[in-house]
Amino acid sequence: MRRRSRMLLCFAFLWVLGIAYYMYSGGGSALAGGAGGGAGRKEDWNEIDPIKKKDLHHSNGEEKAQSMETLPPGKVRWPDFNQEAYVGGTMVRSGQDPYARNKFNQVESDKLRMDRAIPDTRHDQCQRKQWRVDLPATSVVITFHNEARSALLRTVVSVLKKSPPHLIKEIILVDDYSNDPEDGALLGKIEKVRVLRNDRREGLMRSRVRGADAAQAKVLTFLDSHCECNEHWLEPLLERVAEDRTRVVSPIIDVINMDNFQYVGASADLKGGFDWNLVFKWDYMTPEQRRSRQGNPVAPIKTPMIAGGLFVMDKFYFEELGKYDMMMDVWGGENLEISFRVWQCGGSLEIIPCSRVGHVFRKQHPYTFPGGSGTVFARNTRRAAEVWMDEYKNFYYAAVPSARNVPYGNIQSRLELRKKLSCKPFKWYLENVYPELRVPDHQDIAFGALQQGTNCLDTLGHFADGVVGVYECHNAGGNQEWALTKEKSVKHMDLCLTVVDRAPGSLIKLQGCRENDSRQKWEQIEGNSKLRHVGSNLCLDSRTAKSGGLSVEVCGPALSQQWKFTLNLQQ
């Protein structure tokens, strides 16, 4: 009897111990209700808020697995990386120009934590959205040359901190022959970071291709070296590529102020575009496009062009499509070339509103270009224009006449690539992808903005019988888009500049264009630097712009009479 009692007590003890272990290990948390769980109520998984559910999934699964994972010898997790030791040796000394090295305020950059908090700038709908659980992992390729260590470190840490661990296969840093090899080498201690160093300066395109060739994941993510990734930035990008491997997708690029490093959310109503000078610009969506998105403001945005610094792409599609033009140098024009190539060869470009990544926008480059930045950009741009733009390349040469004098090298392999991929003509691109870009008419002598210094001729929103004025050039067309025709009319849509009174000081009016109306006849004189009214021999003048509008005055050397079209089609 005593023996049986002893056995029962032992069994009871083991049973209690087992229950305690079960509760402690989390298996009975639903039964226990948890601290503050509310009167022992069971928390049903289907009733948990989606965001909380996602966090629970990560914390109970991926992060636990990551914490148990053994790191390779010499590697550390990013929270254990010594930021002070890495950044400290390159900090700006007292009296030094904080902008000298990087063309942004390095002192402010160096003050920030490598994992600083930034505002979540996503739309509310994005914060409630659930992403596919079977997304492919990505290799993140970051190229740099003499980047500020604090900015480079924040880029790497933000990728690791703001991404589900299982979606980051690796971060490949390609050091494009920086002066100090340790800028990259020291970061190789961080988990998942691989460092490749060029043995000479190669430039952005060839460096990115080297990183892509070394990548082990099926999806490539290209980032600049002065970025900060926002909450759940990666999942929406990977999801779009997983659904269609011919999509090339970019986040909304938020602004990191170059002076104080404040993080500011960018508008979600922008698309990438360009003028005929082939310089990238941001275009606002048309009112019709904005209205069509009111029901789903976080839907992907088809964009004619990507900025080029930040995008995600299927690795095999990147290879099939011809990677980058390896004959392009340093920086510039590569986003133009890859955008044309993707669209014309069967792919598409998208901006994904639920993905946000901050980027430091600078006013000038901190590094040197062999032969000068203008020459390198013109050479790269000419290569893109000659391969992809067909006869429309002539509008580029009209906008940038000096580009004709810049040798662009051999493009035979790129022309063969275009033929092999059965790519569409540029006319198709203009009609189907970028109809907003105005194409000069065959009757036009000059086209585009009519510039006077930093100001441009502007309708000021006026219509028939309204005056015209000048306004700061915005490079967005619209009220500042004009054409000088072979019939000598200065046109804005169906309205023409009209001299109502042929006396000096008379205001110019917008009136409906009429054939053979002498009041609407203009010609360019003095090397296309002035506009003279044919009937009165008076010149277009802006001296009275602030007091009422533009006028005609006796032609003279005044700066108020200097005007230049962005495209002169007859040089």
UniProtKB/Swiss-Prot annotation:
Site keyed Not glycosylated: positions: N516
One term under GO cellular component: Golgi membrane
Cofactor(s), names only, from the UniProt record: Mn(2+)
Residue numbers bearing the Phosphoserine modification: S536
InterPro entries xref list: GalNAc-T, Glyco_trans_2-like, Nucleotide-diphossugar_trans, Ricin_B-like_lectins, Ricin_B_lectin
Annotated Gene3D superfamilies: 2.80.10.50, Spore Coat Polysaccharide Biosynthesis Protein SpsA, Chain A
Tissues where the protein occurs: Detected in urine (at protein level). Widely expressed.
Ricin B-type lectin domain mapped to chain residues: 443-566
CDD domains: beta-trefoil_Ricin_GALNT2 (cd23434), pp-GalNAc-T (cd02510)
Catalysed reaction, written as an equation: L-seryl-[protein] + UDP-N-acetyl-alpha-D-galactosamine = a 3-O-[N-acetyl-alpha-D-galactosaminyl]-L-seryl-[protein] + UDP + H(+); L-threonyl-[protein] + UDP-N-acetyl-alpha-D-galactosamine = a 3-O-[N-acetyl-alpha-D-galactosaminyl]-L-threonyl-[protein] + UDP + H(+)
Annotated segments matching region Catalytic subdomain B: 300-362
Biased composition (Basic and acidic residues): 53-66
GO biological process entries: O-glycan processing; positive regulation of immunoglobulin production; protein maturation; protein O-linked glycosylation; protein O-linked glycosylation via serine; protein O-linked glycosylation via threonine
SUPFAM superfamilies named in the record: Nucleotide-diphospho-sugar transferases (SSF53448), Ricin B-like lectins (SSF50370)
Compartments where found: Golgi apparatus, Golgi stack membrane; Secreted
Residues annotated for substrate binding in this entry: T143, D176, R201, S225, W331, R362, H365, Y367
Disordered: region residues: 53-74
Topological region Cytoplasmic: 1-6
Residues annotated to bind Mn(2+): D224, H226, H359
Parts of the chain that traverse the membrane: 7-24
Record's bilayer topology term: Single-pass type II membrane protein
Domain notes: There are two conserved domains in the glycosyltransferase region: the N-terminal domain (domain A, also called GT1 motif), which is probably involved in manganese coordination and substrate binding and the C-terminal domain (domain B, also called Gal/GalNAc-T motif), which is probably involved in catalytic reaction and UDP-Gal binding. The ricin B-type lectin domain binds to GalNAc and contributes to the glycopeptide specificity.
Sequence similarity: Belongs to the glycosyltransferase 2 family. GalNAc-T subfamily.
Entry's disease: Congenital disorder of glycosylation 2T: A form of congenital disorder of glycosylation, a genetically heterogeneous group of multisystem disorders caused by a defect in glycoprotein biosynthesis and characterized by under-glycosylated serum glycoproteins. Congenital disorders of glycosylation result in a wide variety of clinical features, such as defects in the nervous system development, psychomotor retardation, dysmorphic features, hypotonia, coagulation disorders, and immunodeficiency.
Protein name per the record: Polypeptide N-acetylgalactosaminyltransferase 2
Organism of derivation: Homo sapiens
Protein encoded by which gene: GALNT2
